[in-house]
């Protein structure tokens, strides 16, 4: 029975990934995205992001993503699916399949103002969704280590410290 449950969960995650990847394909480049696509990014890189918003990691992801379409679409899908996946791991749901669908449904009914600032354009997405995913991983690690007193594998601990550092950039 456990194999069937895992299989259903895997299929749901693949469907969520495909949905968000397709959304990424349909989403056109907007104002900031087009700026990063132009020579603006080389000017900003020359001065080390000095006049920018301080979201260095998101801006670097944005620069790469606007120049490599397939990577932009795939990262849009993976980060979006990763947020749902991390929420499920934080909550430690027993009925995984139904909760994945519930979390996905709730993500789809975001208020339009929040959607416009995050999922509605790639600059906002890489600045906010990426940091949300990193924050969720940090919360997941802390809950497991502090509340449940679970010993984390070395690789997860290293990832925790790396993401904690880069999450501030």
Which ranges hold each PLM region?
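Transmembrane-helix motifs of polytopic, lipid-linked glycan transferases
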Residues: 77-99, 137
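Short hydrophobic/aromatic helix or loop-helix immediately within or flanking a transmembrane segment
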Residues: 48-80
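Membrane-interface helix-boundary motifs at transmembrane edges
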Residues: 2-4, 88-98, 146-154
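Extracytoplasmic catalytic/substrate-binding loops of multi-pass membrane glycan-assembly enzymes
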Residues: 22-40, 49-60
């Amino acid at each position: 029975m456990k194999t069937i449950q895992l299989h259903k969960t895997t299929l749901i995650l693949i469907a969520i990934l495909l949905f968000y990847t397709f959304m990424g394909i349909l989403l056109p480049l907007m104002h900031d995205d087009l700026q990063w696509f132009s020579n603006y990014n080389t000017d900003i890189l020359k001065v080390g992001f000095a006049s920018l918003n301080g979201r260095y990691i998101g801006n670097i992801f944005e620069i790469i993503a606007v120049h490599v379409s397939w990577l932009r679409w795939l990262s849009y899908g993976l980060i979006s699916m990763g947020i749902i996946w991390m929420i499920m791991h934080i909550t430690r749901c027993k009925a995984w399949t139904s909760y994945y669908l519930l979390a996905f449904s709730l993500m789809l009914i975001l208020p339009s103002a929040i959607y416009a600032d995050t999922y509605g354009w790639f600059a906002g997405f890489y600045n906010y969704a990426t940091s949300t995913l990193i924050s969720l991983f940090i919360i997941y690690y802390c809950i497991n280590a502090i509340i449940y007193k679970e010993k984390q594998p070395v690789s997860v601990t290293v990832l925790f410290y790396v993401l904690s550092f880069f999450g501030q950039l």
